[in-house]
């Protein structure tokens, strides 16, 4: 019985997740349902192989309905300590905290 090469599996899974989300970005203006399916598959692969999806890629689709954000389909509001992205498809609000820049002071 062969042993699983987990590093290789996770590398392939990470590449596949990046590819699927990139394809979703390309297809979101053409076939919205297909773009949503690509995001769904990317999330399933990431969960199956326990691969993290980077924050920059997570911010490109709705967490609830998995539709990629498209012009006119989401609203962005900036508050003091956070950015609020509202999906106009399902109404889900994603709140992204903004951390103030730290000033390094030498005493």
From Swiss-Prot:
GO annotation terms (biological process): tRNA 5'-leader removal
Species the sequence originates in: Archaeoglobus fulgidus (strain ATCC 49558 / DSM 4304 / JCM 9628 / NBRC 100126 / VC-16)
Gene Ontology MF, one: ribonuclease P activity
Cross-referenced InterPro entries: RNP4, Rpr2/Snm1/Rpp21
Cellular component terms (Gene Ontology): cytoplasm; ribonuclease P complex
Binding site for Zn(2+): 62, 65, 87, 90
HAMAP family according to UniProt: RNase_P_4
Reaction catalyzed: Endonucleolytic cleavage of RNA, removing 5'-extranucleotides from tRNA precursor
Keywords for this protein: Cytoplasm, Endonuclease, Hydrolase, Metal-binding, Nuclease, tRNA processing, Zinc
Known role: Part of ribonuclease P, a protein complex that generates mature tRNA molecules by cleaving their 5'-ends.
UniProt key word Cytoplasm: yes
PANTHER family the record matches: RIBONUCLEASE P PROTEIN SUBUNIT P21, RIBONUCLEASE P SUBUNIT P21
Primary location: cytoplasm
Name of the molecule in the record: Ribonuclease P protein component 4
Family: Belongs to the eukaryotic/archaeal RNase P protein component 4 family.
Cofactor dependency: Zn(2+)
Enzyme Commission identifier(s): 3.1.26.5
Subcellular localization: Cytoplasm
A Pfam family per the record: Rpr2
Self-association and partners: Consists of a catalytic RNA component and at least 4-5 protein subunits.
């Amino acid at each position: 019985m062969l042993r699983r090469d987990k590093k290789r599996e996770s590398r392939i899974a990470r590449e596949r997740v990046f590819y699927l989300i990139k394809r979703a970005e390309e297809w979101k203006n053409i076939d919205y349902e297909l773009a949503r399916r690509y995001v769904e598959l990317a999330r399933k692969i990431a969960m199956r192989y326990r691969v993290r999806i980077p924050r920059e890629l997570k911010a490109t689709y709705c967490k609830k309905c998995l539709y990629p954000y498209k012009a006119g389909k989401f609203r962005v509001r900036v508050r003091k300590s956070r950015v609020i992205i509202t999906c106009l498809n399902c109404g889900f609000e994603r709140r992204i905290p903004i951390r103030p820049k730290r000033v390094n002071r030498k005493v």
